Amino acid sequence: MIKNDLLLKALKGESVERPPVWMMRQAGRYLPDFMKLKEKYDFFTRCRTPELATEITVMPIRQIGPDAAILFSDILVVPQAMNIEVEMKPGVGPWLPNPIDSPKKVEQVIVPDVNEELGYVFEAIKMTKQELNDEVPLIGFAGSPWTILCYCVQGQGSKTFDKAKRFCFMNPIAAHTLLQKITDTTIAYLKEKVKAGVDAVQLFDSWGGLLEPKDYQEFSWKYMQQIIEALKDEVPVIAYGKGCWFALDKMAKSGAAALGVDWTCEARNARYLSGGEITLQGNFDPARLYSKPIEIKYMVNDMIKAFGKDRYIANLGHGILPNIPVDNAKAFVDAVKEYKE
């Protein structure tokens, strides 16, 4: 039995004394101990070494005290497993030297044996579960097929992912073939994560908000829906789409246990659009963690009041920024823990 099961209760829609809290990218660069490991090991070495991934995953639990751990990894380990070369370049971010920018290249993309290619992730989950000793739940995650396609086609990060969009609109058959391959791999990957011991999973659709609503349904949501459908009876699924407030009504009917919202969508609008029955997660602006700790506390209180303490998970609206002071991150977590109605 997990000692602190606030997150799992919130995902089931049960009443809680206060909302659970965790932060996207909480095992990250704002932690000085993380930076020490970053100096010694490159990014994918940290992802692929179960001992390091475990150490990094547990770091924020010990240092800032959130109610859940999220496995240290990256959404781009999935395309790596699919025989697509992915590097992490300092100062650039993800770099794919051979983008999947033609129908012929899509044919060469494989649907792998996830145990063979991603066994190190499942090993890290088992090790992390042991290290956590049932203190808090462990969340596993994957990128949405659309978000992964964005990197695979664009070849790197982008504000517009114009090449990815062009590819989908000019080669829709090839685009859907690639999206289905990513979806099939992601389902197998997440099912193995569940077997290894994760207590919940989150789908990150970081770039869904770049699509207009009709294209979002076609190129993103229908693949996320497949993943939710395949997983929902085994584990609670959190569906997060940055800038995807326009799809909250459809997302709420998907079988997901919770929906993540960003800071551009007010709590009352998110509740209204999602029908008021589903658990919501979010939506503190990550840049607001630059504010003074006392201001963070007031803003967190306002956020919880706006969402209501039940069917709610306090989180940021996207990942924590790299140079946020640790004390401010802790002030965010503490403010949720100290919340009283």
Swiss-Prot record:
GO terms for biological process: protoporphyrinogen IX biosynthetic process. Substrate binds at residues 25-29, 44, 74, 151, 206, 318. Its EC number is 4.1.1.37. It is an enzyme of class 4 (lyase). One of its GO terms (molecular function) is uroporphyrinogen decarboxylase activity. It catalyses: uroporphyrinogen III + 4 H(+) = coproporphyrinogen III + 4 CO2. Keywords: Cytoplasm, Decarboxylase, Lyase, Porphyrin biosynthesis. It is found in: Cytoplasm. Its main location: cytoplasm. Pathway: Porphyrin-containing compound metabolism; protoporphyrin-IX biosynthesis; coproporphyrinogen-III from 5-aminolevulinate: step 4/4. One of its GO terms (cellular component) is cytosol. The keyword Zinc-finger does not apply. The record marks 74 as: Transition state stabilizer. Pfam families: URO-D. Belongs to the uroporphyrinogen decarboxylase family. HAMAP family: URO_D. Catalyzes the decarboxylation of four acetate groups of uroporphyrinogen-III to yield coproporphyrinogen-III. Homodimer. This is Uroporphyrinogen decarboxylase. It comes from Christiangramia forsetii (strain DSM 17595 / CGMCC 1.15422 / KT0803) (Gramella forsetii). The gene is hemE.
